[in-house]
Structures are given as C-alpha cells and as structure tokens.
Amino acid sequence: MDLININGVRLEVKHVAARPAGVQGSTGLAPLVFLHEGLGSVAMWRDWPTQLCTATGREGWVYSRRGYGQSDAVPDVRGASAVVNGQRTGRLLPDYLHEEAWTVLPALVKTLKLENPVLVGHSDGGSIALLHASRFPVSACVVMAPHVMVEDVSIKSIRQARTAFEAGDLRQRLARYHADVNCAFWQWNDVWLSDAFRSFDIRDNCRTIAAPLLAMQGVDDVYGTMRQIEEIPVYRRQNKHFPTSYIDSMLYKLEQCGHSPHRDQTELTTQLIAEFLAGVS
C-alpha cells in the first residue's frame, strides 16, 4: 500500500502497470484513473482494474478517497460541518462530489504527474468523473451507474443500506475494506439522506464536457434508473486526434445488471470500455 499527501490528507493509492502480452515499456496511451463508488475503496475494486488495464494496454491508478479504505479518516464524521486548518471536518456537505472533482482530483493528477487521463468512475465516482471532465482536460470519461440527479429509488435504497448497516451484516462486510468503517459508511449515508442533498443535479455541468464519453447503466440497478445516463447531454464531438473524424459519446443499457457493471457483467463491461478506448490516445 502506498500513501500520498494531497492537500494535507494521506490518500491510499495503487499503481497498476498491467500491459498486454508481448508489450514492453510504456504504451504512450493516457492512463486510467479509477474513481470508486460511495462505499468503495482500492480493495473493493478487486482485480478488475488490472483486467481493464490489460485489455486496454494502459497503466492505471486507483485511489481511496478520504475516509475510505486506508486513507485518512474524516474527523468527527457525524458532527457539524467545519473547516479546520484548511481541511473539512464533520458531516459531508452537499457539494462533496464537486469538491472531490474540482479540488482533490486535480491535485492528485498533478502529484502523480498524469496528463489528460482517462477517468473510469463508478456510482459516486462516476459523478466525480463527469464533474471533473466538465472543467479539466481528460482524454476520455467512462462512467458506470453515475448519479447526475437524485431519484426516489436512490433514497429508498440508501435508507435500506442504513438499516442493513445498523441491524444487518453490512457493517461487518464493509469492515474488510475500510480502516474506519464507521467513517466510510456514515459520511456517505448521512449526506445522501440529508434534505439539502435532494437538489443535487449536475446535468448542466455535463453540457461542458468536451471529451469522449461512455456511460453504462444496469437495468436492475436499485440505486438509479436509466434516466441517470439518458439525461446526460450527449453531443457528436470532433475527434481532436483525427480532425476529419468524430467520436460519438455512447450510452449503454446493460441487461441482467445491477448497480455494479464491472462485477455483474464483467466481461461485457471490460469489452465495451476496451472497444470505446481503442480510438482514444
């Protein structure tokens, strides 16, 4: 495990150097940066980042956000929101995804000396990827089950997750992946169930994304409907690498798939992303 200091917070990072068979050294392709779900971490991705890096011929970087995995915890995670010595403490604010996308992720990309990475985001990580791509240069943006707005089905499932954490085995299962499981769970659950978060909506932000975009949504996702990707504004954009051709943004509806395409439909998800990125440097 490696830890890097980003704006005074130690974040867990993992470098994936997988390459296709027979390839030596760098491929020169933009690296993948993996952005995990609301209860995720480096470890919860398991070996899928390695699978995708191998399939695409790209190196990858995986990191755990503050309060997740082995990264620093958030002090007083259920207390009043505050800023102490330049760091946020207490409950997450409704703009926590914006903060991660526009402050933390740019600093991490700079620290790792990455240039125009390909973002691969799942759930909350998908929202972060979209927000980051709306303001910062990326080679492409791949999102799985992103949240672009709040739906009733999302709130219902997050309430059920709270019950499972307090009275079921969810806490025990999550504890395998997080140094501070209470911090990991409550920072996510509290903000999502707050009244202030109901107005979360990033559809307008998505209009300024200039990079190729691939969005996937499972039809059986209990945290969101197909609207989450259908309402991402999609345009036909000129391919900067080939001025006479175009890369279309793509939306995929995945059958027999829940909230985690990379786990529920691993082979298909990996194939779709690899094919999409084949035209991206």
For each of these PLM feature ranges, what is it?
Residues C257-T270:
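Catalytic histidine-centered segment of alpha/beta-hydrolase-like enzymes
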Residues W188-N205:
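Active-site nucleophile elbow and catalytic-triad environment of alpha/beta-hydrolase enzymes
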Residues A18-D76:
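Conserved HGGG/HGGXW glycine-rich cap/lid loop of the alpha/beta-hydrolase fold
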Residues I209, A215-Q217:
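Short beta-strand/loop motif that positions the catalytic acidic residue
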Residues E115-E151:
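Conserved hydrolase catalytic core segment
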